Amino acid sequence: MSEDHTKADNLSEKDPHSPERSDSSSHEDAHAREEEESSDDDGALDGKPASLIAIVMIALSLIGLQLAVFLSALDTTIVTVALPAISAHFNSTAAYTWVGSAYLLANAASTPIWGKLADIFGRKPMLLLANALFMIGSLVCALSINVGMLITARAIQGAAGGGLLTLVDTIIGDLFSLRTRGTYLGMIGGVWAIACALGPIVGGAFTSSVTWRWCFYINLPIDGLAFGIIFFFLKLKTPKTPILEGFAAIDWAGSFFIIGGTLMFLFGLQYGGITFPWDSATVICLLVFGVVCIVLFGLVEWKFARFPIIPLRLFQYRNNCGALLVAFFHSFVFTSAFYYLPLYFQAVKGATPILAGVYILPAVLSTGVSAAATGAFIGNTGNYLIPMYFGMSMMILGYGLLINFDAGSGWAKLIIYQLIAGIGNGPNFQAPLVALQTKIKQSDIATGTATFNFVRNIATAISVVAGQVLYQNQLKKMTSTLQQLGPAASLIAAGDAGANTQAINALPTPQRDLARSAIADALSPMWIMYTAFAAAGLFCILLVSKTELTTTHEVTEVGLEAQKKAEAERKAERQAKDLEKAQKS
């Protein structure tokens, strides 16, 4: 897109967050007004001051939203230290890979759909649906009698989890002004970071003390509480969209191509070099057809979709592309710490599952604190660029230091390096989302947020696969050295060290030390890769522009009629631009 065209877009389209477009001077008033318009029964609240009602409802709603995000994030990592026990229970090393990957793959593939569903049917109904699906998936996981049943249930969890995070971020964007939402998005980011980091600790505690099934049972009461709070206290206007008409408006072709393309591409990465050689027909076909489907998805969104899942107009600004790239690289790097640090502590340091979770507490605490502090900083200053630069710089330093983790690393090094990496993790959970929302209309908040989280989820899934591939391929290069381990050599050389940590700990001391050193050496190139990706993310921040965050609020219209109205407005804008160009020529 040319620079002149971009300027024309900027001139013809007012800042969607400008005071002239604001419908309210405070989010409390907007929230109270939505209560009046909502189909929910608010009669029990009559007679109370509106401002007090708004404050109470917002506080309770935020608790419910944070619980929903906590669940989605917790299940991203809770199984990481439980995977060896799950693999042993089902006598399946494949479970070590697929129980974790099924959640991430489904999470990534489903995310774009939730944003458009929320636009058509409303935020609250879709959030409740995601909660219900997550509860069903959790129950089936806990009751699984074979690995196939468990993997399928994890996929259901993943699809629902993608909706939980996307819809919560969207609702925050609906309720608060740009300046204010930075604080609340920071809170959500802090909850997400802490839950991701607590996952291995909670999973390790259940695996060691009770059973791995409690990694899924624990979701049921939390999910039930979140569902109840959201149902009774989150007051949002729900459109009365006819079910059949609403489903007819969904971009089914785009949904098919984005889900199919995402899954095929990620399956190709998952299989490559492990299950099948990289040059095998299976891997090549999956990768090629996955890319083809994604290209076809772009074509459908551009030319055919009336209500696109990922509208291409989101990418017309350099700022938006930069924010999405920063989100991609941040997620790619952040994910590695909470997937592979537990592996390091179990396989190299000989820790039990619960201790592996405890040993990553320095990264847990520093990540959560820095994420929440970033939200407060953005809310107070309106500046989101400083946290982005600071966070990525600290990630480069922190993950670069992790390269030095070896079998003999002392506790001072293990703690300090994790603290630095964790401080770098926090700032870019939500700062790029704030940057993205400065250049999109309020009517595009849901699709923009869904696109943002889709990019993050794709990065997470690719990160886990890329780390596994690099780690396992490094171990294969050490086959001759590992032959000294006897029967255990084949397990480690095949990349199954994570699923066989107990076998490694049972080796005689000389062989055990050799195995642990080999695993640490295999992890080192992986940290080099993640450090390089953090550096790439730092450069991408240069694409992000500085925009003043407004303190005014605009109420988001949802429903099929609102979608039609927004589309008509965009069509009128395009026609006005074309007419202006014709007059100039």
UniProtKB/Swiss-Prot annotation:
The keyword Metal-binding does not apply. InterPro entries: MFS (IPR011701), MFS_dom (IPR020846), MFS_trans_sf (IPR036259). The chain crosses the membrane at residues 51-71, 94-114, 132-152, 158-178, 186-206, 214-234, 247-267, 280-300, 323-343, 353-373, 385-405, 414-434, 449-471, 524-544. It is found in: Cell membrane; Vacuole membrane. PROSITE patterns: MFS. Induction: Expression is positively regulated by the dothistromin-specific transcription factor aflR. Residues 35-44 have a biased composition (Acidic residues). The keyword Nucleotidyltransferase does not apply. GO terms for cellular component: plasma membrane; vacuolar membrane. Residues 1-45, 564-585 are annotated as: Disordered. PANTHER family: DRUG TRANSPORTER, PUTATIVE (AFU_ORTHOLOGUE AFUA_3G08530)-RELATED (PTHR23501:SF102), MAJOR FACILITATOR SUPERFAMILY (PTHR23501). Efflux pump; part of the gene cluster that mediates the biosynthesis of dothistromin (DOTH), a polyketide toxin very similar in structure to the aflatoxin precursor, versicolorin B. One function of dotC may be to transport early-stage dothistromin biosynthetic intermediates from the cytoplasm into vacuoles, thereby affecting the rate of dothistromin production. Belongs to the major facilitator superfamily. TCR/Tet family. This is Efflux pump dotC. It comes from Dothistroma septosporum.
